[in-house]
Structure formats: C-alpha cells, structure tokens
A protein has these predicted regions:
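N-terminal binding-site loop/beta-alpha segment at the start of enzyme catalytic domains
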Residues: 1-79
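Short, acidic/polar
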Residues: 31-45, 91-106, 150-155
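Conserved beta-strand positions
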Residues: 17, 55, 83, 113-116, ...
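Active-site mouth loops of central-metabolism enzymes
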Residues: 23-36, 84-93, 117-123
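Active-site groove signature of glycoside hydrolases
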Residues: 103-122
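Short, well-ordered coil/turn segments that N-cap beta-strands
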Residues: 9-15, 49-52, 76-79, 108-112, ...
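Acidic (Asp/Glu)-rich catalytic clusters
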Residues: 7, 69-77, 100-108, 136, ...
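Beta/alpha (TIM)-barrel catalytic core signal, keyed to glycine-rich beta->alpha loops juxtaposed to Asp/Glu
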Residues: 3, 119, 123-322
C-alpha cells in the first residue's frame, strides 16, 4: 500500500474505504450487511494497509459512524477516520455539538479529519470555519477538510480558517475528471489532498454495465446509465479494458490506479464484499506506464455525458409505446 503524507494526519493510504453504504438501506445491503460483512470489510482493509476511512454524520443518520467505530475496535485511534459535518446553521456552538455526536458514535476522543460536507450556498465560510478553528486549536481534531468545494471556495475556506484546509473530497473519476483542471494542480502546489469519491462512477468503470445490462436500485437513476451516455462511454471503457488486459487486472482496478497515479490524490471507494476491498487495495500498487496514463486521461477528457434532463427525456421516450 502506498501512502501520502498530509499535514496534521501523517501517512494516509492512497486507497481508503468509503462507508456511506454502512447503515444506508437505499443501497440494498440491509441490516445483515451492517452487522456482519461491513465489519469483515473493515478488518480486511486494515490487514491490507488501508488507513483512511471516510464517513459522515448523515450517512445512515449516524449508523455509518457507529458501525465503523465498532468495526475498527481498538485500532480506531491508529487510523485516519474522516467524518463530515453537514453545514446547517454551522455556528461555532453547533459545530462543536455535532463534533461531539460524531466522536461519541465513532468512540473517539479526537477525530483526525473533520470535513465540511458541502458548501453552504447562503452561509459563507467566515461563519463555518471559526468553529472548526476552535476544535483544531483545542486538539479535538487533527485537521480540517472540505467536500464538494470549488477551488475558489476552497481558498476562501483557507482564509476563513487561518490555517490550511488540508483536503477537498470531490466527485472525481475517469468519467468525471474536472478536478484535473484546477483542484489537483492546487493540491500538488500547496501540499494538500484531493479525496476522490465515487471513483468507479457507481460501477460504470468496472466495465460490467452496458445498454443491455444496466444496474438496478439507487444507481438506476444515475444519468450515466442512460442509453446515450452508455454509448458515449464506450470509447473510454474500451481504453480502460485495453489497459486492464495489458496488466492482467480488472478494469475497475485500472480506474483506481489512474487516480492514485495523480499527484496528491487518494481514493475512497466503497466495498460490498471482502473480495472487493481486496481488489481495491491492490490497485494502489499498479504502475501505469506514461503512455497508458496519457491514453486514459485523453479518453476521460473526451467523454462528454449528456445532461440529466436529456437522460430523463430519453427514458420517458423509451417507455412510451411504439
């Protein structure tokens, strides 16, 4: 497992584990998964050298944090647990209380990374960050991060905190590569960390799905799985399969390897099984050749998915009688 050194956090594994599905019924995993498989996944992740575990107070209404804390057991203080505060009325007393709730569920006295879950469209970071700074100065958290922030908003958060905001967790994959344009260069220049969530585009980059084989459940509503977008994704998926075949690994592993080959980027894929977390962790050690990296990047930039509105119209038309 490869690592990234981050101020306030130390060594962070380049492949982490996202736990949004822990305790979330909409993913269809259910209570049996939460009480059994989820804990086995966390234990195996630790055995494989994973040190970064991401969660949030809103995932499963706190159940994700609770399940993760229990699964980590005595090792919970030895890893980088990253959780998030949802910025509703994010005044300092509220932020302190929300941190206390997360810490209690995770069974931690000190949280390594505390993130603002998304930018509040009305309340500026000059309101949110004083509470985060108080927690930082008091030693209740190791570092401050943000999520879903533009570069300009990330820099504004820096100024409001008066200290570096060490990370920005964003939607980032071969199917959504916009972070390449500004967030990754900023992170490289300033020594920050970009955390890529949904790095496999909800399974699209695994190469399993196509026009005649689409996912069910909550992913069925994702515009990426519309007919036109699946057609447009084929050139990207073709390059992905070609590189995967050259390395003798799965397409999903190449999609992760491309991300972790980028400067200052870590990935936090979820896992529905122990086998999946093993495959994800192995991706950290895949060395892509420069020409393979370039081909994947070019294919990612060339992918232009149609909008959610167009996909909705397309789906309505597909259901109309001919």
């Amino acid at each position: 497992m490869r690592h990234l050194d981050v101020d306030g956090l130390g060594a962070v594994s380049r492949v982490g584990l996202g736990t949004w599905q822990f305790g979330s019924r909409e993913w269809g995993y259910g209570d049996a998964y939460a009480s059994g498989e989820a804990k086995a996944i966390v234990r195996r992740a630790r055995e494989l050298g994973v040190t970064l575990f991401d969660t949030a107070e809103v995932y499963g209404f706190g159940r994700s944090e609770r399940i993760l804390g229990e699964a980590l057991g005595e090792e919970r203080a030895e890893v980088v647990v990253a959780t998030k505060v949802f910025p509703v009325a994010p005044f300092p007393p509220v932020v302190r209380n929300r941190l206390a709730g997360s810490a209690r569920r995770l069974e931690l006295d000190r949280l390594p990374l505390y993130q603002v879950h998304q930018p509040n469209p009305v309340v500026p970071d000059t309101v949110t960050m004083p509470g985060m700074r108080q927690l930082l100065d008091a030693g209740r958290i190791g570092a401050v991060g943000v999520s879903n922030y533009s570069l300009a908003r990330w820099q504004a958060a820096d100024a409001a905190l008066g200290r570096p905001v060490v990370s920005n967790q964003v939607h980032f994959s071969l199917a959504a590569p916009s972070a390449l344009d500004d967030l990754v260069p900023f992170a490289e220049r300033e020594g920050r960390m970009v955390m890529a969530y949904s790095p496999l585009a909800q399974g699209l980059l695994g190469g399993r799905y196509g026009v005649d084989d689409r996912p069910g459940g909550v992913r069925a509503a994702n515009p990426l799985f519309g007919t036109e977008n699946l057609r447009r994704a084929e050139p990207l998926l073709g390059v992905l399969r070609e590189v995967a075949a050259a390395h003798g690994v799965a397409a999903a592993q190449i999609a992760l390897a491309w991300l972790v080959s980028l400067p200052r980027v870590v990935v936090i894929p979820g896992a529905s099984s122990v086998a999946q977390v093993e495959a994800n962790a192995a991706a950290a050690d895949i060395d892509l050749r420069p020409d393979e990296q370039a081909a994947l990047t070019a294919a990612a930039r060339a992918f232009r998915p149609v909008s959610a509105v167009r996909t909705l119209v397309e789906r309505v038309r597909e259901r109309l009688p001919v």
